[in-house]
Amino acid sequence: MELSPRAAELTNLFESRIRNFYANFQVDEIGRVVSVGDGIAQVYGLNEIQAGEMVLFANGVKGMALNLENENVGIVVFGGDTAIKEGDLVKRTGSIVDVPAGKAMLGRVVDAMGVPIDGRGALSDHEQRRVEVKAPGILERKSVHEPMQTGLKAVDSLVPIGRGQRELLIGDRQTGKTTIAIDTILNQKQINSRATSESETMYCVYVAIGQKRSTVGQLIQTLEEANALEYSILVAATASDPAPLQFLAPYSGCAMGEYFRDNGMHALIIYDDLSKQAVAYRQMSLLLRRPPGREAFPGDVFYLHSRLLERAAKRSDQTGAGSLTALPVIETQAGDVSAYIPTNVISITDGQICLETELFYRGIRPAINVGLSVSRVGSAAQLKAMKQVCGSSKLELAQYREVAAFAQFGSDLDAATQALLNRGARLTEVPKQPQYAPLPIEKQILVIYAAVNGFCDRMPLDRISQYEKAIPNSVKPELLQALKGGLTNERKMEPDAFLKERALRLI
């Protein structure tokens, strides 16, 4: 029996409709909350979920899958868990946790998820980047060779940092770790103002982990007053935020910094501080019933920090020659650098700047212990003139500390020992610097050159700061610019005469 044209047409229509019935059909995998509390939700039914995938709870709160077990999935909640109840639906998003990145982020304050919290509206043009990505491989990297100037005499002369380096700031609470980090951000202002191309500009990302809101507010005010917020991004996971957000914040900040690194630009990222991130991760791990190890930290706490800090790198010329410099901060308890987290991070980084309470109270600020501080790769990036000027100063300081310990017994000292003590006292005085007053590198070179060459030896210690202020204001700008290259014999004569003449006025 043949179908009429009308019936055949209808049959074809039905067949095509049935064939395309599932074409635009969206299937969501959903699960149900079994238990919830302390920022952790156990969810049943998400069998296909990936590790690190973002999920959405019924009340709109987001979470991330961390524990994949036989029956349940352990999910950390990015927000308050009070509105989540047993039996609530949980939906997979199918995407790994990502955050916004790009130049639109500059000048903004965001939370660990990249959501603006500064009350200045939504973000404009930006791209999304995953918070967890693999660090650049060996062939994609280049050795550190460009200086990253902090504006601090003690750092730029004795523990220099290069673009792409990881330099740890370690010390007890209230020793000036955050101040060094902020000074470094402020110093980029004058470097960026002189930059002639994008490849010279340095962008900054500051990640505040577990700090008080008032402290973060003061930091924002300091950066705004110095017009430093225009090239900076602030990521804040304060003490009142849940542990999962404090754990996530450094990775979010790193993803924002990687945007600049991967596009041939330079960025500096400060993690303040990673001790609090480790504590937040310990809290999450124990609540997820992971077995505790040393100091109750989970076994993978080393990997927590190593996978983060390995993402700071200097890229090769073939991959854009960008860089990401990391300054992680670690807080020690009573100066114990041999604790678990400090030793972990020391072994990951390319050097450390050690700050001590005793030096801080003695008025040596920044309170850097030059003997314990080291920069493993920074000397390759140090300016030639600075290297020439301060080459012997570290050795002289070490000799001074050794001799000063014996000199306090009051025995008679010969002329050579007395000269060493005089020089050492001045070399200890010169690196002192007030808070939020970074010094351009060429002015630093002149000040240190004067101290190393003995122009301050007969000067009272309390006049050294006056001498320092008098130097830069009277030096020809051409000479300051020339000092950036290196000190030839011809160039040395002009500063020598000038510095001696200034010193004689203050003796």
UniProtKB/Swiss-Prot annotation:
Keyword Endoplasmic reticulum belongs to the record: no
Domain of life per record: Eukaryota
Main localization category: mitochondrion
GO cellular component: mitochondrial inner membrane; proton-transporting ATP synthase complex
Subcellular location: Mitochondrion; Mitochondrion inner membrane
Chain positions of site Required for activity: S373
PROSITE patterns referenced in this protein's UniProt entry, alphabetically: ATPASE_ALPHA_BETA
Listed SUPFAM superfamilies: C-terminal domain of alpha and beta subunits of F1 ATP synthase (SSF47917), N-terminal domain of alpha and beta subunits of F1 ATP synthase (SSF50615), P-loop containing nucleoside triphosphate hydrolases (SSF52540)
Binding site for ATP: G171, D172, R173, Q174, T175, G176, K177, T178
GO molecular-function term, one example from the UniProt record: ATP binding
Keyword tags: ATP synthesis, ATP-binding, CF(1), Hydrogen ion transport, Ion transport, Membrane, Mitochondrion, Mitochondrion inner membrane, Nucleotide-binding, Transport
Pfam families: ATP-synt_ab, ATP-synt_ab_C, ATP-synt_ab_N
Assembly information from the UniProt record: F-type ATPases have 2 components, CF(1) - the catalytic core - and CF(0) - the membrane proton channel. CF(1) has five subunits: alpha(3), beta(3), gamma(1), delta(1), epsilon(1). CF(0) has three main subunits: a, b and c.
Family (UniProt): Belongs to the ATPase alpha/beta chains family.
Functional summary from the UniProt entry: Mitochondrial membrane ATP synthase (F(1)F(0) ATP synthase or Complex V) produces ATP from ADP in the presence of a proton gradient across the membrane which is generated by electron transport complexes of the respiratory chain. F-type ATPases consist of two structural domains, F(1) - containing the extramembraneous catalytic core, and F(0) - containing the membrane proton channel, linked together by a central stalk and a peripheral stalk. During catalysis, ATP synthesis in the catalytic domain of F(1) is coupled via a rotary mechanism of the central stalk subunits to proton translocation.
Protein name (database record): ATP synthase subunit alpha, mitochondrial
Source species: Brassica napus
